[in-house]
C-alpha cells in the first residue's frame, strides 16, 4: 500500500500545476496528463497499437490500429491503457476523446475503472448504437464481459472531440457516465463488486485519440 501511495505521489508530481479538489465531490486531484511531455505514465496492453503524436499543434495519445496483439483470457476490450501507480475506489475522471474512424453501430471508446487484474474490472463501452454488447456499463469478473445496464441512449460520435466523465462512489455503489452533457448521465448503475483499483482508457477494437485526462479520487 505504501508503494502504491508513493507511486501515486510521483505520478501527480510529474504533472503541474494541479487544480483544487473536485467541487462536487471534494475529492483531491491525483493525476493529470495532457500528453505534452509524452506517455510514460501509461501501461498499455500492446505498445505497437498506441501512438503519441501531434494533431493540430497539440500532443495526443491514441490507438493507431483496430487489430491488437493482446488476447484477453475473458472476452473483453483489447486496447487498454492504464494509469501507472494510481489506484482509487471513489473518483471523478474526465478526458477528451476523438473517434478517428466510423466503424458503424459499435464505434466506441472505453473507460476502465476499479481494475483489479486482467480478468476483474468494470468498463463502460461508449458504443454508437446500444445493444447487449455495445453502449453499456460492463463487468468482467473471471468470465466474459457482462452488461450491467440496459441503456438505450445512442452515443453521437462524429469527427470532432467529445468530453467524457465517469463518476464512481464505491460506498453507494453508484457509477455514472457522462458524454458531452456534464449534468445528465447517459447511463448509470449500482454495483459493489470491486473497490479500489486502477483507471484506464481505450477501446474494444476501434481507433481513438485521447487528451486532457484528469482524475480526482481516493
Which residues are covered by each model-predicted region?
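Flexible glycan-contacting loops in extracellular carbohydrate-active proteins
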Residues: 187-212
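Bacterial N-terminal signal peptides that target proteins for export
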Residues: 1-7
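Short tryptophan-centered beta-strand motifs in secreted/extracellular beta-sheet-rich domains
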Residues: 35, 95, 160-170, 175-177
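Extracellular carbohydrate-recognition regions
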Residues: 22-47
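Secretory/extracellular carbohydrate-interaction modules
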Residues: 69-139
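Extracellular glycan-recognition surfaces and repeat-rich motifs
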Residues: 39-69
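Short, aromatic/His-centered strand-loop micro-motif at the edge of beta-sheets
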Residues: 142-163
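Beta-strand-rich interaction surfaces with strong enrichment in secreted/lumenal proteins
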Residues: 79-86, 150-156, 200
Amino acid at each position: 500500500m505504501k508503494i502504491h501511495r508513493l507511486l501515486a505521489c510521483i505520478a501527480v508530481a510529474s504533472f503541474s500545476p494541479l487544480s483544487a479538489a473536485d467541487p462536487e465531490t471534494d475529492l483531491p486531484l491525483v493525476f493529470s496528463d495532457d500528453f505534452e511531455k509524452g506517455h510514460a505514465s501509461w501501461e498499455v496492453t500492446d505498445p505497437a497499437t498506441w501512438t503519441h503524436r501531434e494533431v493540430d499543434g497539440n500532443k495526443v495519445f491514441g490507438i493507431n490500429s483496430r487489430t491488437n496483439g493482446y488476447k484477453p483470457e475473458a472476452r473483453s476490450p483489447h486496447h487498454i491503457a492504464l494509469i501507472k501507480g494510481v489506484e482509487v475506489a471513489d473518483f471523478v475522471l474526465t478526458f477528451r476523446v476523438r473517434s478517428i474512424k466510423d466503424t458503424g453501430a459499435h464505434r466506441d471508446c472505453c473507460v476502465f475503472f476499479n481494475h483489479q487484474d486482467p480478468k476483474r474490472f468494470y468498463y463502460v463501452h461508449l458504443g454508437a448504437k446500444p445493444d447487449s454488447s455495445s453502449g453499456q456499463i460492463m463487468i468482467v469478473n473471471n468470465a466474459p464481459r457482462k452488461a450491467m445496464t440496459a441503456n438505450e441512449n445512442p452515443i453521437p460520435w462524429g469527427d470532432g472531440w467529445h468530453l467524457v466523465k465517469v463518476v464512481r462512489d464505491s460506498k453507494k455503489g453508484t457509477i455514472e457516465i457522462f458524454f458531452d452533457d456534464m449534468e445528465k448521465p447517459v447511463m448509470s448503475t449500482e454495483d459493489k463488486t470491486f473497490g479500489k483499483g486502477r483507471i484506464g482508457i481505450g477501446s474494444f477494437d476501434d481507433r481513438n485519440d485521447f487528451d486532457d485526462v484528469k482524475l480526482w479520487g481516493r
